[in-house]
Protein backbone atom coordinates (compact mmCIF):
# COMPACT_ATOMS: atom_id res chain seq x y z
CA UNK A 1 0.00 0.00 0.00
CA UNK A 2 2.93 2.38 0.58
CA UNK A 3 4.13 1.72 -2.99
CA UNK A 4 0.62 2.39 -4.33
CA UNK A 5 0.56 5.68 -2.43
CA UNK A 6 4.12 6.65 -3.39
CA UNK A 7 3.56 5.91 -7.10
CA UNK A 8 -0.08 7.09 -7.06
CA UNK A 9 -1.17 4.03 -9.02
CA UNK A 10 -2.10 0.37 -8.57
CA UNK A 11 0.01 -2.61 -9.66
CA UNK A 12 -0.76 -4.24 -13.01
CA UNK A 13 0.58 -7.65 -12.07
CA UNK A 14 2.56 -9.67 -9.56
CA UNK A 15 4.61 -12.84 -9.38
CA UNK A 16 6.37 -14.41 -6.42
CA UNK A 17 7.25 -17.32 -4.19
CA UNK A 18 6.43 -18.26 -0.62
CA UNK A 19 6.09 -21.16 1.74
CA UNK A 20 5.61 -22.47 5.25
CA UNK A 21 8.86 -23.10 7.04
CA UNK A 22 8.59 -22.19 10.72
CA UNK A 23 5.01 -22.85 11.70
CA UNK A 24 4.80 -25.77 14.10
CA UNK A 25 3.39 -29.02 12.68
CA UNK A 26 -0.16 -29.41 13.92
CA UNK A 27 -0.48 -25.69 14.61
CA UNK A 28 -3.79 -24.52 13.16
CA UNK A 29 -2.59 -22.73 10.05
CA UNK A 30 -3.06 -23.06 6.32
CA UNK A 31 -1.14 -19.90 5.42
CA UNK A 32 2.43 -19.31 4.35
CA UNK A 33 4.85 -17.78 6.86
CA UNK A 34 6.92 -16.03 4.19
CA UNK A 35 6.30 -14.37 0.82
CA UNK A 36 8.53 -12.61 -1.73
CA UNK A 37 6.55 -10.78 -4.41
CA UNK A 38 7.49 -8.57 -7.35
CA UNK A 39 4.79 -6.06 -8.31
CA UNK A 40 4.78 -4.40 -11.76
CA UNK A 41 3.25 -0.93 -12.18
CA UNK A 42 1.89 0.74 -15.34
CA UNK A 43 4.79 3.23 -15.47
CA UNK A 44 7.37 0.41 -15.68
CA UNK A 45 8.36 0.55 -12.01
CA UNK A 46 8.97 -2.77 -10.27
CA UNK A 47 8.53 -3.14 -6.51
CA UNK A 48 10.09 -6.03 -4.57
CA UNK A 49 8.14 -6.86 -1.41
CA UNK A 50 9.06 -9.43 1.22
CA UNK A 51 7.44 -10.46 4.47
CA UNK A 52 7.94 -13.22 7.00
CA UNK A 53 6.62 -14.40 10.34
CA UNK A 54 9.50 -16.23 12.01
CA UNK A 55 9.56 -16.38 15.81
CA UNK A 56 12.79 -14.82 17.08
CA UNK A 57 13.57 -13.31 13.67
CA UNK A 58 13.98 -9.69 12.72
CA UNK A 59 10.83 -7.67 13.32
CA UNK A 60 10.54 -4.49 11.28
CA UNK A 61 8.40 -2.72 8.72
CA UNK A 62 10.06 -0.29 6.35
CA UNK A 63 10.00 0.96 2.80
CA UNK A 64 12.86 2.09 0.59
CA UNK A 65 12.63 3.35 -2.99
CA UNK A 66 15.71 3.33 -5.20
CA UNK A 67 16.02 5.86 -8.03
CA UNK A 68 18.69 7.05 -10.44
CA UNK A 69 20.30 9.34 -7.87
CA UNK A 70 19.75 7.56 -4.57
CA UNK A 71 17.28 6.23 -2.02
CA UNK A 72 14.02 7.52 -0.58
CA UNK A 73 13.26 6.22 2.90
CA UNK A 74 10.57 7.32 5.31
CA UNK A 75 11.79 10.70 6.52
CA UNK A 76 15.01 10.83 4.48
CA UNK A 77 16.53 10.96 1.00
CA UNK A 78 20.18 9.95 0.48
CA UNK A 79 22.48 9.58 -2.50
CA UNK A 80 24.29 6.30 -3.22
CA UNK A 81 27.23 7.28 -1.01
CA UNK A 82 24.87 7.76 1.95
CA UNK A 83 25.01 11.56 1.93
CA UNK A 84 21.72 12.96 3.22
CA UNK A 85 20.08 15.12 0.54
CA UNK A 86 16.90 15.81 2.51
CA UNK A 87 15.69 14.94 5.99
CA UNK A 88 12.32 15.46 7.62
CA UNK A 89 12.65 18.30 10.12
CA UNK A 90 9.14 18.22 11.58
CA UNK A 91 7.94 16.94 14.96
CA UNK A 92 9.59 13.74 16.18
CA UNK A 93 7.15 11.94 18.43
CA UNK A 94 8.06 8.37 17.53
CA UNK A 95 10.96 6.42 18.96
CA UNK A 96 10.56 3.84 16.20
CA UNK A 97 13.57 3.53 13.88
CA UNK A 98 11.23 2.04 11.28
CA UNK A 99 9.23 5.28 11.22
CA UNK A 100 12.45 7.19 10.53
CA UNK A 101 12.28 8.75 13.98
CA UNK A 102 9.29 10.80 12.84
CA UNK A 103 5.69 10.80 13.99
CA UNK A 104 4.40 7.24 14.04
CA UNK A 105 2.09 6.84 11.01
CA UNK A 106 -0.06 4.26 12.79
CA UNK A 107 -0.70 6.74 15.60
CA UNK A 108 -1.55 9.44 13.05
CA UNK A 109 -4.21 7.14 11.54
CA UNK A 110 -5.74 6.59 14.98
CA UNK A 111 -5.63 10.31 15.78
CA UNK A 112 -7.41 11.17 12.52
CA UNK A 113 -10.09 8.52 13.08
CA UNK A 114 -10.70 9.61 16.68
CA UNK A 115 -10.85 13.30 15.66
CA UNK A 116 -13.41 12.48 12.94
CA UNK A 117 -15.57 10.60 15.44
CA UNK A 118 -15.35 13.35 18.05
CA UNK A 119 -16.05 16.13 15.54
CA UNK A 120 -18.67 14.15 13.59
CA UNK A 121 -16.79 14.79 10.34
CA UNK A 122 -16.42 12.35 7.45
CA UNK A 123 -13.27 10.28 7.12
CA UNK A 124 -13.50 7.88 4.21
CA UNK A 125 -10.48 5.67 3.60
CA UNK A 126 -12.50 2.90 1.92
CA UNK A 127 -10.72 3.25 -1.44
CA UNK A 128 -7.28 2.99 0.16
CA UNK A 129 -8.37 0.09 2.34
CA UNK A 130 -9.88 -1.80 -0.60
CA UNK A 131 -6.99 -1.23 -3.03
CA UNK A 132 -4.38 -1.94 -0.36
CA UNK A 133 -6.10 -5.19 0.62
CA UNK A 134 -6.57 -6.26 -2.98
CA UNK A 135 -2.90 -5.57 -3.76
CA UNK A 136 -2.06 -7.97 -0.91
CA UNK A 137 -4.54 -10.54 -2.30
CA UNK A 138 -2.85 -10.17 -5.71
CA UNK A 139 0.57 -10.86 -4.18
CA UNK A 140 -0.65 -13.76 -2.06
CA UNK A 141 -2.45 -15.35 -5.02
CA UNK A 142 0.77 -15.08 -7.04
CA UNK A 143 2.79 -16.87 -4.34
CA UNK A 144 0.13 -19.50 -3.63
CA UNK A 145 -0.36 -20.30 -7.33
CA UNK A 146 3.28 -19.97 -8.40
CA UNK A 147 1.99 -18.12 -11.46
CA UNK A 148 1.97 -14.44 -12.48
CA UNK A 149 -1.31 -12.72 -11.65
CA UNK A 150 -2.85 -9.70 -13.38
CA UNK A 151 -4.71 -7.16 -11.23
CA UNK A 152 -7.68 -6.63 -13.58
CA UNK A 153 -8.13 -10.34 -14.38
CA UNK A 154 -8.03 -11.30 -10.71
CA UNK A 155 -10.44 -8.50 -9.87
CA UNK A 156 -12.89 -9.81 -12.50
CA UNK A 157 -12.45 -13.50 -11.58
CA UNK A 158 -15.43 -15.49 -10.27
CA UNK A 159 -14.32 -16.28 -6.75
CA UNK A 160 -15.14 -15.27 -3.20
CA UNK A 161 -12.80 -15.37 -0.23
CA UNK A 162 -15.71 -15.30 2.24
CA UNK A 163 -18.88 -17.38 2.52
CA UNK A 164 -22.03 -15.56 1.44
CA UNK A 165 -23.71 -16.22 4.78
CA UNK A 166 -21.21 -16.64 7.60
CA UNK A 167 -22.57 -18.06 10.86
CA UNK A 168 -21.10 -19.78 13.92
CA UNK A 169 -22.28 -23.08 12.41
CA UNK A 170 -20.63 -22.52 9.00
CA UNK A 171 -18.03 -25.02 7.85
CA UNK A 172 -14.67 -23.25 7.46
CA UNK A 173 -13.31 -23.16 3.91
CA UNK A 174 -10.18 -25.01 5.11
CA UNK A 175 -10.35 -27.84 7.63
CA UNK A 176 -7.60 -30.03 9.13
CA UNK A 177 -6.97 -33.62 8.10
CA UNK A 178 -7.31 -36.56 10.52
CA UNK A 179 -3.91 -35.70 12.05
CA UNK A 180 -4.84 -32.06 12.66
CA UNK A 181 -2.71 -30.67 9.85
CA UNK A 182 -4.10 -28.07 7.50
CA UNK A 183 -3.53 -28.36 3.74
CA UNK A 184 -1.21 -25.72 2.30
CA UNK A 185 -1.67 -23.96 -1.02
CA UNK A 186 0.62 -25.69 -3.53
CA UNK A 187 2.09 -23.72 -6.45
CA UNK A 188 0.97 -24.90 -9.90
CA UNK A 189 -2.15 -26.58 -8.45
CA UNK A 190 -3.64 -23.81 -6.26
CA UNK A 191 -6.90 -22.36 -7.49
CA UNK A 192 -9.05 -19.66 -5.97
CA UNK A 193 -12.24 -20.95 -4.41
CA UNK A 194 -15.42 -20.43 -6.37
CA UNK A 195 -18.33 -18.78 -4.64
CA UNK A 196 -18.72 -20.39 -1.21
CA UNK A 197 -21.92 -20.87 0.70
CA UNK A 198 -22.33 -21.50 4.41
Give short role names for the model-derived ranges:
Residues 1-198:
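Contiguous beta-strand/loop segments that form the cofactor/metal-binding neighborhood of enzyme cores
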Amino acid sequence: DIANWFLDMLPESAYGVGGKQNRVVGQPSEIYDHHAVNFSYPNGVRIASQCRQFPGGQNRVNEEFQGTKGFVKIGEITDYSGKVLWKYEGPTKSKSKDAGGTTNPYQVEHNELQAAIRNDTPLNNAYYGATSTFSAVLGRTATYSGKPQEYEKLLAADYNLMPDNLTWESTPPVVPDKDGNYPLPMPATYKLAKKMTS
